[in-house]
């Protein structure tokens, strides 16, 4: 495992962490709701920067290999209607 520190941003501003809690329905069991959680500090994706934004009807999570050159590893979009809560931890001075 590498010790590269990833930068976490919320709407482009550096923060300590972002946690998004949301729910999903099971495909074969629509009555079953599964609570999911995205935690930027615990996410295993190796990247330089992860930027979380609420844009229109989605929470957009973008993983950058190189943010200054806009080289994106991948994006995830979570519909806002399934989001239960978003926690943003600011950087400590």
How should these model regions be labeled?
Residues 38-74:
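Acidic, low-complexity, intrinsically disordered interaction modules
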Residues 3-5, 33, 58, 76, ...:
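N-terminal functional modules and adjacent low-complexity/disordered segments of proteins
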Residues 21, 62, 74-76, 84:
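Serine/threonine-rich low-complexity intrinsically disordered regions
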Residues 52, 76-91:
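Structured surface patches comprising rigid loops and adjacent beta-strands/short helices at the edges
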Residues 2, 91-93:
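Short acidic DE-rich linear segments
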Residues 1-53:
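Anionic N-terminal interaction surfaces
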Residues 23-27, 64-68, 88-91:
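Short, flexible beta-strand-to-coil junctions
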